[in-house]
Amino acid sequence: MPVKHWSRAGLMLTAWCNARCASCYLCCGPDRADEMPVATALRVWEELIAASPHGCRIHLTGGEPFGSWERLIELCLAARAGGLGPLESVETNAFWASSPALVGERLRALDQAGMGKLVISADPYHQQFVPIERPRLLARVGEDVLGAHRVQVRWRDWLETGGDTDCLAPPEREALFARYAAAGRERVSGRAAFSLSASLPQRSPSQLADTSCSEPLLRAKHVHVAPDGSVMPGTCGGLVLGRCDHESVAVMWQRLGQDWADRPVVGALARGGPAALLATATAAGFVPEKTYAGKCHLCWHVRRFLHRHGAGEGELGPDWLYQA
């Protein structure tokens, strides 16, 4: 099966985030210190564009990329000065948006540095840590500075009708999270596998046995690059396709196309989905739960076991993601 070129990539500038959201499939939080140096980000950005005949659209993400404003704007300005492809978007939870003046100043700077869209996170999980007035302020000023077509909110309905969730009693907040997760918007892996899975419809591992993962792993054309250079499928945090700190993106992509089927983790998932990886883990002593909230939940549980038992070397990481 040919591996499609990556035409969209998110550079994780940091694993740090002011929030520790129940929905975070990358397990980011205030205790994460991993950062991608500007020089590394520029090199990877350039290599991603060069490795694909169609180019590669870049978005900057985290963690929370606004955790270091100076580094964020330095990267954007350097990328523009270096003639790299357009910056598709920058993502943020708006924790920093404390005044119209500050928001306007930073958005004008990003606009001049070539940012396409501003992507704002707003949902019950983020509002446990970020007052909802901050994403509302950011969206409002963003539409004035950039135009409404360049401001994207995930999710707009919550931004308009939601509220702060840190003030809710834990049972009330958990019930709200459960109702929101039931809409199917979240990836049930990482922290979400522990925080949200119990409230979702459950299926036995045998009911998840007919789902190959070849499309999201090899054909989806979207990846994330972690601060340490680990390249992960766009929606599969903790599954490593290669390391662009060890070799160029082009060489890494070629290597994946040549040997993906021989890789113990990626190969098993591409052929038979989490059920195939479950067989490997069971032989090593893994005991599955009776039910899971979908194949991503099962996959995460299996991968976490394998990582903790020293299996999947080079394919499971970064390490901090599995230590949550």
Segment roles from a protein language model:
Residues R108-E247, V251-R255:
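Radical SAM enzyme [4Fe-4S]-AdoMet core and its adjacent flexible, acidic
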Residues P30-R32, G67-S68, A97-S99, H126-V130, ...:
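Short catalytic/ligand-binding loop motif for oxyanion handling, primarily in non-cytosolic enzymes
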Residues V103-L107:
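Acidic, amphipathic alpha-helical patches
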Residues G238-A324:
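Flexible mid-to-C-terminal extensions adjoining Fe-S/redox cofactors in radical SAM and related proteins
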Residues C17, C21-C24, P216, G229, ...:
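Short cysteine clusters
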Residues A15, E64, T92-A94, P124, ...:
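Short, flexible loop/turn elements at secondary-structure junctions
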Residues M1-P86, V90-T92, A97, A101-L102:
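Conserved alpha-helical substructure of the radical SAM core
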Residues W6-R8, P53-R57, G85-L87, A113-K117, ...:
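A general structural motif
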